[in-house]
């Protein structure tokens, strides 16, 4: 298995698809990386030479991926929460922050339904 940016890339997949195993690399960025390095994107990962893998490692190293990207995303959300802006408050409350309705939907963000509390008579 090839190892790029601390991630094992599956051998049986095409280079373009295999690179998407790296957090922060999608299909379009994977294709751009392949074009920049001259590595054919439809070539299987197991057929790549060591020189090809080294080129890919160098090119992926220029992009913010994996732990750095996760840390950056977390810091951005924390900054919003510290500012006390609308989006930060919604993050803090665990609600959607892009204007979706929450009266009936938003179950993914709000979590499972809670049982209603019965009043004593």
Curated annotation (Swiss-Prot):
SUPFAM superfamilies: S13-like H2TH domain. Gene3D superfamilies: 1.10.8.50, 30s ribosomal protein s13, domain 2. Residues 91-121 are annotated as: Disordered. One of its GO terms (molecular function) is rRNA binding. Keywords: Ribonucleoprotein, Ribosomal protein, RNA-binding, rRNA-binding, tRNA-binding. GO terms for cellular component: cytosol; small ribosomal subunit. It comes from the Bacteria. Pfam families: Ribosomal_S13. The keyword Signal does not apply. GO terms for biological process: translation. Disulfide bonds: none annotated. Part of the 30S ribosomal subunit. Forms a loose heterodimer with protein S19. Forms two bridges to the 50S subunit in the 70S ribosome. Belongs to the universal ribosomal protein uS13 family. Located at the top of the head of the 30S subunit, it contacts several helices of the 16S rRNA. In the 70S ribosome it contacts the 23S rRNA (bridge B1a) and protein L5 of the 50S subunit (bridge B1b), connecting the 2 subunits; these bridges are implicated in subunit movement. Contacts the tRNAs in the A and P-sites. This is Small ribosomal subunit protein uS13. It comes from Cupriavidus necator (strain ATCC 17699 / DSM 428 / KCTC 22496 / NCIMB 10442 / H16 / Stanier 337). The gene is rpsM.
């Amino acid at each position: 298995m090839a190892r790029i940016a601390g991630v094992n890339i599956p051998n049986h997949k095409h280079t373009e698809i295999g690179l998407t195993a790296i957090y922060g690399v999608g299909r379009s960025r994977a294709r751009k990386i392949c074009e920049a390095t001259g590595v054919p994107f439809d070539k299987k990962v197991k057929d790549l030479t060591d020189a090809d893998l080294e080129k890919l490692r160098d090119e992926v190293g220029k992009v913010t991926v994996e732990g750095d990207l996760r840390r950056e995303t977390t810091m951005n959300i924390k900054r919003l929460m510290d500012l006390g802006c609308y989006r930060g408050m919604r993050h803090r409350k665990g609600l959607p922050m892009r204007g979706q309705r929450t009266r009936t939907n938003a179950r993914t963000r709000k979590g499972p339904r809670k049982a209603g509390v019965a009043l004593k008579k």
